[in-house]
Amino acid sequence: MTYPGPPRPVRISATPLAELADQLGVAAPDGSAEITGITHDSRAVRPGDLYAALPGARLHGADFVTQAAGLGAAAVLTDPAGAERAAAAGLPALVVDDPRARMGELAATIYGHPGRDLLQIGITGTSGKTTTAYLVEGGLRTAKSTGLIGTVEMRIGDERIKSERTTPEATDLQALFAVMRERGTEAVAMEVSSHALVLGRVDACVFDIAVFTNLSPEHMEFHSGMEDYFQAKAQLFTPKRSRLGVVNVDDEYGRRLAKEATVPVVTYSAEGHPDADWRADEVEVGPLDSTFTVLGPKGERIAAKSPLAGPFNVANTLAAIVALAAAGLDPQSAADGVAAVPGVPGRLERVDEGQPFFAVVDYAHKTDAVESVLRALRKVTEGKLHAVLGCGGDRDTTKREPMGAAVARFADTAVLTSDNPRSEDPLAILATMLQGAASVPAHERGEVQVFEDRAAAIAAAVARAEPGDTVLVAGKGHEQGQDIAGVVRPFDDRQVLREAIKKTQG
């Protein structure tokens, strides 16, 4: 039988419900239920599962307890509000005030604490998580059987699984770790979002290495401000969550974190910060990749190559090499493995149909990331730079004007368009972006165009491109759908860009 959701281990020992009750410090329900899995999704329940019925913004997971029971749930983890409904369904219940806060530890127990048998490297930061995770996994492959968990996909060996979110829920994450252990995986590179840290998705995880890339305004619809955002990230650098930190001291929040972290910290700098333990030197940035020398704390000189363009990818590559060295890999072997990574989906991903201009798709969807990628492309563009950009709906509204200003300032042609409008009016989002673009003085501003339709915007940018120019389509990267008014329709920037180029090629 095929079940929805991420994979689960084939072999698992049952855990008595009474043992889980004892772990929670609550009275054991009547009966002798045995638990062989856990899920927070009533649709993904398997026989023998503990169904975590969590309170939500609109609905309570206990509303679906009858469905869970019908699929074979053996018991329920819930709060007092959900306990009565669980009893009505005839299921024994573990009742705690905050079931989400206890879900991770129970999942780890049920699956036999699989994370303890894996070398775990977690990466957090506003930008660079995905790229750094791919580079770390590439380096790990030189010495170990690997797994990858992140925004684009999850990988167990050569099996690829589409990701629902950057960091899976704790129930799914512990199951993934158990599958990795069962299949002989030795090490995993994983993105850790601030949401994951705040919402308990990485509860029961203790990362061998925790990497901090940078911090800039993002997710302000979730965090109360930058201090709250920083404190969320800083949780990863405590003994409860990691054993060693690898921190970028080119970033102001990284410098603060290096001082405030309560685990040992190794620092790195792509800009040659004299106090950093590891530094990038002799950096040569090219149109497709960069080379540099890594200087280590013991006089190491390591030849390194970033397989991706841009100074920011020098920083990501350095982060990966330092993390791998901190994990005990030979630094030069690690650097060679990182250099061999073929690319990262949707991160400065080139689209080449033989056209006489450079065309790339990138996930940049924050002001600093947009500026960074435009600056990097400007350095390697002989002609003009044409950029397509939108802002997502139902997300941080404060970044819309700054992003409009950034693309207008750093591109010769700024084509403003829809991203994922979700429930918002696309034209209202574009109007705010246009205000930002208009705030840039005329002598510093490129030509600004507005197309509500994203495919039309991409076609317009391609139509303007001449030999030696660059076309950047930013914001969605690897995504393969566009959310408009709650309906997700197929849309892949890479494919749409490819088709637009083909049409110009005749």
UniProtKB/Swiss-Prot annotation:
Compartments where located: Cytoplasm
Key word Nucleotide-binding present in the record?
A: yes
Protein name per UniProt: UDP-N-acetylmuramoyl-L-alanyl-D-glutamate--2,6-diaminopimelate ligase
Report a single Gene Ontology molecular function: UDP-N-acetylmuramoylalanyl-D-glutamate-2,6-diaminopimelate ligase activity
Primary residence: cytoplasm
Enzyme Commission number, as recorded: 6.3.2.13
Write out the GO biological process terms.
cell division; cell wall organization; peptidoglycan biosynthetic process; regulation of cell shape
Species whose genome carries this gene: Streptomyces coelicolor (strain ATCC BAA-471 / A3(2) / M145)
The protein's matches in SUPFAM superfamilies, at most eight in alphabetical order, are given as:
MurD-like peptide ligases, catalytic domain, MurD-like peptide ligases, peptide-binding domain, MurE/MurF N-terminal domain
Residue positions where N6-carboxylysine is found in the record: K233
In this UniProt entry, which cysteines form S-S bonds?
Answer: none
Chain positions recorded as ATP binding sites: G125, T126, S127, G128, K129, T130, T131
Q: How is it modified after translation?
A: Carboxylation is probably crucial for Mg(2+) binding and, consequently, for the gamma-phosphate positioning of ATP.
Q: Which domain of life is it from?
A: Bacteria
